[in-house]
Amino acid sequence: INNNVGGHGPSTDGIDIDSSTNILVENCDVDCNDDNICIKAGRDADGLRVNRPTENVVVRNCIARKGAGLLTCGSETSGSIRNVLAHDLIAYGTGTTLRLKSSMNRGGTVENIYMTRVEADSVTHILSVDLNWNLHPAWTKNKYAGFTSNN
C-alpha cells in the first residue's frame, strides 16, 4: 500500500481500522506519510453517541516504511480500542513503532495492547504517547490501561 509517498499531504494513513470487531491485517507492506496501520473508534461527540469500539484486532507479518507510526491507536478513540495483538512486524524509518494518541475531547478507553517480535530500523521512538494530541474543549476523559511489549 503506497499512499502519498514522498508527498506532504496530511492524514495520509496507510490502513485505517475504525469501529470494527474481529479484524486481521497480515502480510502488508505499507509506505505512507502518516500512520501506517491505524486503529480508531469514533471521533468526538458523534463517536461518543455511536459508541462502537474497535476490538479483537490481530496485525501480523507486516512491514511499515517511513510514516509517523508502524502501529497507531487513535487519535479517534471515543468508542474505545481494546484487545489488539501485533506481532512479527518490521518498521523501517517510521517515527515510532507504537503510537498512542487521543485528546481530551475524544474520550474512550484504550486497553490490552500487546506487541511482540517487532524489528525497528532507523526508528525515532519505540513508544510515543500523546494524551492531548489535538487541543479542544473536553467532552469526556480517556483511559489507557494494559500495554505489553515483548521482543
Predicted regions and their residues:
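Extracellular/periplasmic carbohydrate-active domains that bind, remodel
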Residues: 1-151
